[in-house]
């Protein structure tokens, strides 16, 4: 007679998946933050220095800039960044993530 017991430890698997997913979201958020900051035009440097990356909760990060004129810069009012910063950075990061995580 042979008895085999297979037990699935769902809590450990879920914790491992959550940890890996959080690391992936953090990396993508950091990549976006780095790119949007690098694309920000520089005159005085205030707009570029104004970028902040903050974790909101699990799997959620916020990239913000409270410089009053950042909206105009992002709309393309600078010859240094005529297409703005956020949309081009998002496109680049999305394409990079697709290549990196493609299976």
Q: What are the residue ranges of the model-derived segments?
A:
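Short, Lys/Arg-rich flexible segments
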Residues: 1-103
